[in-house]
Swiss-Prot record:
Pfam families: UxuA. The keyword Oxidoreductase does not apply. Gene3D superfamilies: Divalent-metal-dependent TIM barrel enzymes. It comes from Brachyspira hyodysenteriae (strain ATCC 49526 / WA1). PANTHER family: MANNONATE DEHYDRATASE (PTHR30387:SF2). Pathway: Carbohydrate metabolism; pentose and glucuronate interconversion. The gene is uxuA. Keywords: Iron, Lyase, Manganese. Catalyzes the dehydration of D-mannonate. Its cofactor is Fe(2+); Mn(2+). InterPro entries: Man_deHydtase, Xyl_isomerase-like_sf. Signal peptide: none annotated. This is Mannonate dehydratase.
């Protein structure tokens, strides 16, 4: 297995590369140019610099999360071709630097949605949580402001300030965009970029929608096994696949995560593994990675990855805020380090049992 940690860069992350290097078994990072403007092509110099910084710390960049996709592309505006061309230029820069994985999503407006960034767990830790009743009663603008004010001063991925100023405009732009239209626009995007991906062997790994159902009336198209299989089969390329995020798909208890993993053999390029606790229909709290702390069977999930021969990068996903750490919600050092070691322990046990 290749264990990694997500790292947002020295100017945006409370966790340092030195600290990541000291987590047992962690070989590298999944990172991004966090200050890049969505829609612009990345500069070769910037990619070289962050690659050198990571390698100087004794680590490796195993992938990018994310090269965000402008809403013009998702909506299918006439301007999309210009921004797809910029995206292709970015892929070329990454490919020339030997970076061969991009995790991305195709969620409208919000990359992910939570009702609380600091829900208190029985052990006193705090976690991200979702309550559909709260979401149903809150205005999107108000929710955005609330999330931003509770971010501990960090810019959250997918919640960039420039989106806040355009929120009402974006909702207007998505009127008339249903699941089918959004899927058509995803297929258009993938068809356009696949030749470049194949040239440089860049695996495009779409991230499931989070949570795995419609929010604020916006379409959601990557929420279950059927959606994912349709997506990977719609654009036939060895570079078109999935980031298997156990937590995002697991937000809907109807999704059988081990079954989904086995159904996608050969199409999973990257894995996010985390636990959550279902508290009621449409309500969940994130939890420690340990199976008994939540509703998900982490052993069964890791066993499914082992059974399909998965050799790509893993990362522990959102961690609890523990031991008085102040960090970007979900992305502190301590609980993710615990998660990384726990997942590797499961993998070692499964591997030895299989011999």
């Amino acid at each position: 297995m290749i264990m990694t940690l997500r790292w947002f860069g020295k100017n945006f992350d409370s966790v340092t590369l030195k600290q990541i290097r000291q987590i047992p078994g962690v070989k590298g990072v999944i990172t991004t140019l966090y200050d890049s403007k969505v829609g612009d092509a990345w500069k070769e110099e910037d990619v070289k610099n962050i690659k050198k910084e990571v390698e100087d710390a004794g680590l490796k960049i195993y992938g990018i999360e994310s090269v965000n996709i402008l809403d013009d592309i998702k909506i299918g505006l006439p301007s999309r071709d210009k921004y797809i061309e910029n995206y292709i230029k970015t892929l070329e820069v990454l490919g020339k630097e030997g970076i061969n994985l991009v995790c991305y999503n195709f969620m409208p407006v919000f990359d992910w949605t939570r009702s609380d960034l600091a829900k208190v767990r029985p052990d006193g830790s705090t976690v991200l949580s979702y309550d559909q009743d709260i979401i149903d009663k809150i205005d999107p603008q108000k929710m955005f402001e609330q999330i931003d004010s509770n971010s501990n001063g960090f810019v959250l991925p997918g919640w960039e300030p420039e989106r806040l100023s355009r929120l009402k405009e974006l909702f207007e732009m998505y009127k008339g965009i249903d699941d089918e239209k959004l899927f058509e626009n995803l297929k258009y995007f993938l068809t356009a970029i696949m030749p470049t991906c194949e040239k440089y062997n860049i695996k495009m790994a779409i991230h499931p929608d989070d949570p795995a159902w419609p929010v604020f009336g916006l379409p959601r198209i990557i929420v279950n096994k059927e959606n994912i299989l349709r997506m990977v089969n719609s654009v036939n390329s060895p570079c078109n696949g999935i980031t298997l995020c156990a937590g995002s798909l697991g937000s809907n208890p109807k999704n059988d995560i081990p079954d989904i993993i086995r159904s996608l053999k050969g199409k999973i390029f990257f894995a996010h593994v985390r636990n959550l606790e279902h508290t009621a229909p449409g309500k969940f709290q994130e939890a420690a990675h340990l199976s008994s702390d939540g509703s998900m069977d982490m052993f069964a999930i890791m066993k499914a990855f082992y059974d399909i021969g998965f050799e790509g990068p893993f990362r522990p996903d959102h961690g609890r805020a523990i031991w008085d750490e102040v960090s970007m919600p979900g992305y502190g050092l301590y609980d993710r380090a615990l998660g990384a070691v726990y997942l590797q322990g499961l993998w070692e046990a499964i591997e030895k049992m299989g011999k």
